[in-house]
Regions:
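Short, solvent-exposed loop/turn and secondary-structure capping segments
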Residues: 60, 69-70, 98-100, 127-130, ...
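C-terminal catalytic region of ATP-dependent kinase domains
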Residues: 362-489
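Zn2+-dependent metallopeptidase catalytic core
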Residues: 150-158, 227-241
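Active-site acidic catalytic loop and adjacent metal/ATP-binding pocket
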Residues: 186, 331-381, 476
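Short, well-structured beta-strand/strand-turn elements
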Residues: 55, 238-252
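ATP-dependent phospho-/nucleotidyl transfer catalytic cores
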Residues: 199-210, 215-220, 224-225, 256, ...
Length: 515
């Protein structure tokens, strides 16, 4: 500074495309310390804040970032209700400090972990710039992928704060964008201090670092069970299919209760790399992730689909009973993941093909994984079986059925597919052993959270929720036997063949899947 000069200074506000402002600072103030521990208190608390001598503290209680015009700290702040306090230090010759933030929950206990997120109203509810509102433009604000800064704190179920850092957020998902309670993606960014969230958020994952997280409002399940996607993911445990781990939590937005969410892993190159054990940064950056059939440019979520398109064209035009053709496919495709994916989704009755997903790291095979499976356990409909088991020349219904059809033309793979169906039912769908305990875990937790959640977001009653969950459990109980019948018919199995494949499985179902 001045513009074109050789003196480097900090500016209070960026001026992209314009001349720099006149006022710059050679250094910035030191972030103040909120001396009183964030967390849960039975009654009102006095919150003390300190900063180096000569620096003035300004603070807010509405979630916004303090400015030089914010309320000046003159002594401990009396907090009598759940409140977010954000503080910055200022001095005449220094740029304002980074922002300290702490949430104080007053007579507001929780049985589950709590995430407190806060940011300026301009990023949330402003009609021009806020992502939580429709706005005045032709495209709703919440449909835009605007990414804004946000401060987050994570408190474990015992009330201890385990994480506090600046990050960014975006509105995510599809069906929930227009809801009052939206799903939010959280992203750790180096520009805000760290490119990871360093905590073990999920009991069934060994990971302690995440590049992003998902606050999932349960999307299309928000007025039904509020757990289907999470429950069904856990039921798939042991099949080798990646699914997004889940933890029911409560969220506070700018200090206000904002309902039950399921904290989730965010399915992206980083979480898939953790799952697959890939650690090379270059390989992670080169990950290919596709959706639906994977054959259209619009199906590419990350990387490229060139290799996948070549593979699909190959299976459409080659007989896999030729060993060399079969080898070409099995060298490029993780067949176990395909079979496990299809069988699992047929059993749960997942008809939502918009969420078909597959990935590949350099030098690896194309691998299917589970993503947004909350459409499962909603009916006794046979249509999901039809979606997956179409003839090789049939029109796709959102799933790349060509490769499955080609493999099932090979007798040993048809045999393996049927045997694998029996194995998956026995390992994952014996109701009282493997399904009911997972449902009950979520029922016990979410059932306690619902009364307050419903007050905040009406539209679901406890009575209806109970009925919806019971119905989902009944579909999970009864569909395995029905799938056996459908497959037996579609593959033209004789009575002897059905017994050979499924007699033991049916015997177990008669023991564990009865009301």
């Amino acid at each position: 500074m001045p513009a074109g000069g050789d003196t480097w200074l900090y500016l209070e506000a960026a001026t992209p495309g314009k001349a720099n402002g006149k006022n710059g600072y050679a250094a910035r103030a030191q972030e103040p310390v909120i001396e009183t521990a964030a967390g849960f208190y039975e009654k009102a608390v006095q919150v003390a804040i300190s900063a180096p001598a000569g620096q003035e503290i300004r603070y807010t209680t509405d979630g916004s970032e303090p400015t030089r015009a914010s309320k000046r700290y003159t002594g401990p702040i009396a907090v009598s209700k759940t409140t977010v306090i954000r503080a910055r230090a200022f001095a005449d010759d220094l740029l304002g400090s980074t922002t300290a933030g702490s949430t104080f929950f007053i007579n507001d206990p929780s049985i589950v972990p709590v995430m407190s997120v806060y940011t300026g109203d301009a990023y949330l509810y402003n009609q021009k710039t806020g992502v939580m509102v429709k706005g005045s433009g032709n495209i709703p604000n919440y449909e835009k992928d605007w990414e804004y800064p946000i401060q987050i704190e994570y408190f474990d179920a015992s009330g201890q704060r385990q994480l506090s850092q600046m990050a960014t957020f975006r509105v995510t998902s599809h069906s929930s964008r227009s809801l009052r309670q939206k799903s939010l993606g959280l992203f750790a960014r180096k520009a805000f201090g760290s490119n990871t969230f360093d905590y073990a958020f999920f009991d069934n994952r060994p990971y302690t670092q995440y590049s992003s997280l998902l606050l999932r409002s349960t999307n299309s399940d928000h007025r039904s069970c509020r757990m289907r996607d999470a429950v069904l993911g856990e039921i798939s445990e042991g099949l080798g299919l990646y699914y997004q781990a889940a933890q029911p939590i409560v969220v506070y937005l700018n200090g206000e209760y904002f309902g039950h969410y399921n904290l989730r892993e965010k399915a992206n190159k980083d979480s898939l790399a953790q799952w697959a054990g890939v650690t090379d940064p270059a390989a992670i950056r080169a990950c290919d992730i596709l959706e639906r059939t994977g054959t259209l440019d619009s199906n590419v979520l990350h990387g490229s689909n060139q290799d996948w398109v070549e593979l699909m064209n190959f299976v459409k035009s080659h007989d896999l009973n030729d060993p060399s053709n079969l080898q070409y496919v099995t060298d490029r495709l993780d067949v176990d993941s395909l079979f496990n994916y299809v069988i699992f989704n047929m059993i749960i009755g997942n008809y939502d093909v918009t969420n078909v997903r597959m990935y590949r790291f350099p030098g690896g095979k194309w691998t299917f994984f589970l993503h947004d499976i909350e459409a499962g356990c909603m009916s006794f409909d046979e249509s999901p079986v039809d979606i997956f088991l179409r003839g090789k020349n049939a029109k796709a219904a959102g799933f790349p059925h060509w490769v499955l059809a080609a493999l099932l033309e090979v007798p040993e793979y048809k045999d393996y597919f049927l045997r694998r169906t029996a194995e998956i039912i026995e390992s994952n769908f014996l109701f009282s052993l493997q399904v009911e305990p997972v449902f009950n875990k979520y029922i016990d937790t979410i059932g306690q959270l619902l009364p307050r959640h419903i007050k905040k977001f009406p539209g679901l009653t406890i009575k209806d929720w109970t009925a919806n969950v019971n119905a989902a459990m009944n579909y999970a109980r009864m569909r395995p036997k029905r799938v056996i019948g459908w497959l037996s018919k579609r593959f033209g199995l004789s009575a002897a063949q059905q017994d050979a494949y499924f007699a033991h499985t049916l015997e177990l179902l008669s023991q564990y899947n009865v009301k």
